[in-house]
Amino acid sequence: MDFKVADLSLAEAGRHQIRLAEYEMPGLMQLRKEFADEQPLKGARIAGSIHMTVQTAVLIETLTALGAEVRWASCNIFSTQDEAAAAIVVGSGTVEEPAGVPVFAWKGESLEEYWWCINQIFSWGDELPNMILDDGGDATMAVIRGREYEQAGLVPPAEANDSDEYIAFLGMLREVLAAEPGKWGKIAEAVKGVTEETTTGVHRLYHFAEEGVLPFPAMNVNDAVTKSKFDNKYGTRHSLIDGINRATDMLMGGKNVLVCGYGDVGKGCAEAFDGQGARVKVTEADPINALQALMDGYSVVTVDEAIEDADIVITATGNKDIISFEQMLKMKDHALLGNIGHFDNEIDMHSLLHRDDVTRTTIKPQVDEFTFSTGRSIIVLSEGRLLNLGNATGHPSFVMSNSFADQTIAQIELFQNEGQYENEVYRLPKVLDEKVARIHVEALGGQLTELTKEQAEYIGVDVAGPFKPEHYRY
């Protein structure tokens, strides 16, 4: 079995953590019981790219328990929990003779190593992957752009304004084109569908669909209610504070905090800081979200207006160029800057890392002080990447049980219903969304009210649901 992780000797520690996480992930454990005999993913060869955490380990072993074969990489260079990666590789075997799942992930990958790992999840020897499970869209992008450049016969050269990450991506595609011509086209034809975990990846999917280059059906897991309204908000509310505490031990009470973005993730950020006693301001482009922030009690400002007074600045937009180098120069001495959007381009990290008039001092892994020519400095977490995974271990198990149950159900839906979906982007059917919610309500001891037949008819629903129309916003 091929794999590449940091240290297989960490497998026992990882297994203990996985065992504890299983008790906090009732959605996945229920799916294992429900589908144990049916094996709905038998024959599925899943190329998986999600943060290689303890919670993801429970997802991987759920997929294999339902019959799938899996190869896995992380979707972030800093997010891997090395003990979890080791435990998944060892599986039911030993450190000397591992018998688990091929994993290609370790904490602190270089950009070149990251894209090498992504390529490995698509390398199945004589077979081809037939499903993709993605977070952020990098794996899907590799197939789509890889096929495009194969057809052109050339991977284009990097342009002057391309990010270091995109340059590394093109380098990987160039190497594959030389060594394995035709690889990506074959994979594009073999894949039955992709399920996408996060907002950024979903934006990419819709873009590919609009371009007419999406070669297989896609399931938008992010916009399942049991994902976006729970993982994005409640998970962030927990893991953001965890990441900052582990990174800096900074007291948040009384501090001025600027949260950029007030979507579901931004709402979780603002609520988390508010709960710590911080004074929170929000930036937002969407007037509806801005009005929500105001009604929730937060000032709505612009970055330029608020950044000079902020002790902590967090980006949560899923967009690019949110905090410029010029704005960083205006920040307080030793102010904290972090990001909880999927990519590192919300903050102008390129200037921080490449300008001659900026000095970088690493305080500890994923905590860096950048000193400007003025003598002032700022503290940046995880090089502008997801701080809750780079500086901590991500969202708690229970909330990830929601998201990963959605992922598992979406994989089953696409794999078993080949031909019923066009090469477009779909959302998880609401009846399945409600199924995931029901499992977790019961796990928390909640008692659901049962409608009478007359009540159900009165509001135009079935007694067993779904209870809301597709357009309902919750």
From Swiss-Prot:
Signal peptide: none annotated. Substrate binds at T53, D135, E197, K227, D231. Belongs to the adenosylhomocysteinase family. Keywords: Cytoplasm, Hydrolase, NAD, One-carbon metabolism. It is found in: Cytoplasm. Its main location: cytoplasm. It comes from the Bacteria. Its cofactor is NAD(+). Its EC number is 3.13.2.1. Gene3D superfamilies: Adenosylhomocysteinase-like, NAD(P)-binding Rossmann-like Domain. Pathway: Amino-acid biosynthesis; L-homocysteine biosynthesis; L-homocysteine from S-adenosyl-L-homocysteine: step 1/1. SUPFAM superfamilies: Formate/glycerate dehydrogenase catalytic domain-like, NAD(P)-binding Rossmann-fold domains. May play a key role in the regulation of the intracellular concentration of adenosylhomocysteine. This is Adenosylhomocysteinase. It is an enzyme of class 3 (hydrolase). InterPro entries: Adenosylhomocyst_ase-like_sf, Adenosylhomocysteinase-like, Ado_hCys_hydrolase_NAD-bd, NAD(P)-bd_dom_sf, S-Ado-L-homoCys_hydrolase_CS. The gene is ahcY. GO terms for biological process: L-homocysteine biosynthetic process; one-carbon metabolic process; S-adenosylmethionine cycle. Binds 1 NAD(+) per subunit. NAD(+) binds at residues 198-200, 232, 261-266, 284, 319, 340-342, 388. GO terms for cellular component: cytosol. GO terms for molecular function: adenosylhomocysteinase activity. It catalyses: S-adenosyl-L-homocysteine + H2O = L-homocysteine + adenosine.
